[in-house]
Amino acid sequence: MSDSNMVASWSRLAPRLLSVLRIVGAFMFILAGTSKLFAFPAGIPPDGGTVELMSQIGLGAILELVGGGLLLLGLFTRPVAFILSGEMAVAYFQFHFPQSFWPSINGGAAAVLFCFVWLYISAAGAGPWSLDAVRRK
């Protein structure tokens, strides 16, 4: 198989890989929310507890759980991903950035990554394995 044929065959997987990126990212995002809200699968440091529900971090955890669930299903993907991208930008600049410029030092690498993955998905859409795709038919 020539290089151009391999690239062409790999490129055909792009829509499905977009769905995989959305699904895996959403699952990880849900886990971030459940850790904060229910201490599952583990609580938040330093004591392994949960956050105050009526706090800014509590609101973020609700967005992670509900928004992550919608993204997992691929439902209302573009607006939800855009909102969650903004949430992660706020989380980074408000909580991580003041500690250090570098995400690897300030603990904000996941927030930066989620911010840009959700921003991309808000532009690219949910992919073929989604309720949005079913609703379009």
Describe each model-derived feature in a short phrase.
Residues 44-58:
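Perimembrane loop-to-helix junctions flanking transmembrane segments
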Residues 37-45:
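Alpha-helical transmembrane segments and their immediate interhelical/interface regions
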Residues 1-38, 54-62, 66, 73-137:
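Extended, low-polarity transmembrane helix blocks
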